[in-house]
């Protein structure tokens, strides 16, 4: 899978690719990432990339001619993703859709964002949350990492991402490791029992419990299994 990240601050992006599983995926050729400096497409001697907004207002806006020149250099691409707080929510489902593509272009803005005409050249406008950052680099890296980890071979155990939060519509169950007791807090006995069916039941139950506590809106639209539906009914009766 190939990525092109277009940004005014390439040195914010490159270090992220030099650690952990992304670094290994790049070394093994499972993914390719090109980081494009938007300023290289700037105008004039000073490589100007932005201008004041028509109609007045604070801040500067990235010019469409500069942004599209950088974008067209990266084409062809399966998807052109513009990162913006005004975009549609980036979810695990969207990550799975994008992970099936061969080439993604990620447009990371700055200042007051891109001239609105740049949106005509994007296939998707995505947001990673209802808040505003100083730029789109963090959002672009979130999309890159969430999709790259779904590429076969990037994560050693494919079961890992099949059990992730949101994959089945619920949050993940709580995870524990050694020691079995820490400052009076014990690992649930069922996890030490070696009884695989009971462990699976406990995990489903705790995933439901955690989702109800932290993200109750997810439960209403999650495709619950028969076991999960029974566990949910039991929890309702307990209350």
UniProtKB/Swiss-Prot annotation:
Keyword set, alphabetical order: Cytoplasm, Methyltransferase, S-adenosyl-L-methionine, Transferase, tRNA processing
Gene Ontology MF: a single term: tRNA (guanine(37)-N1)-methyltransferase activity
Leading EC class: transferase
Family: Belongs to the RNA methyltransferase TrmD family.
InterPro entries named in the record: Alpha/beta_knot_MTases, tRNA_m1G_MeTrfase_C_sf, tRNA_m1G_MeTrfase_TrmD, tRNA_m1G_MTases_N, tRNA_MeTrfase_TRMD/TRM10
A Pfam family of this chain: tRNA_m1G_MT
HAMAP family: TrmD
EC number of the protein: 2.1.1.228
Subunit structure and binding partners: Homodimer.
Binding site for S-adenosyl-L-methionine: 109, 128-133
Name of protein: tRNA (guanine-N(1)-)-methyltransferase
General function of this protein: Specifically methylates guanosine-37 in various tRNAs.
Biological process terms in GO annotation: tRNA N1-guanine methylation
GO cellular component, one term: cytosol
Catalytic activity: guanosine(37) in tRNA + S-adenosyl-L-methionine = N(1)-methylguanosine(37) in tRNA + S-adenosyl-L-homocysteine + H(+)
Annotated compartments: Cytoplasm
């Amino acid at each position: 899978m190939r990525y092109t990240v277009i940004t005014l601050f390439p040195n914010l992006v490159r270090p992220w690719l030099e650690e952990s599983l992304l670094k290994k995926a790049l070394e093994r050729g499972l993914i390719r990432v090109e980081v494009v400096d938007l300023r290289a497409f700037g105008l004039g001697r000073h490589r100007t990339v932005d201008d004041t907004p028509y109609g007045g207002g604070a801040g500067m806006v990235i010019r469409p001619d500069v942004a599209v020149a950088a974008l067209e250099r990266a084409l062809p691409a399966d998807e052109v993703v513009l990162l913006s707080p005004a975009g549609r929510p980036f979810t695990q489902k969207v990550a799975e859709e994008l992970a099936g593509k061969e080439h993604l272009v990620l447009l990371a803005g700055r200042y007051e964002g891109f001239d609105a005409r740049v949106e005509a050249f994007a296939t998707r406008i995505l947001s990673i949350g209802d808040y505003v950052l100083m730029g789109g680099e963090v959002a672009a890296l979130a999309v890159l990492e969430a999709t790259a980890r779904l590429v076969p071979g990037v994560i050693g155990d494919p079961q890992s991402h099949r059990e992730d939060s949101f994959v089945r519509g619920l949050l993940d169950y709580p995870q524990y490791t050694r020691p079995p007791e820490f400052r009076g807090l014990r690992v649930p006995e069922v996890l030490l029992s070696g009884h695989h069916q009971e462990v699976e039941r406990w995990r489903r139950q705790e995933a439901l419990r955690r989702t109800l506590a932290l993200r109750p809106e997810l439960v209403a639209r999650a495709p619950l299994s028969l076991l999960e539906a029974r566990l949910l009914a039991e929890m309702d009766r307990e209350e």
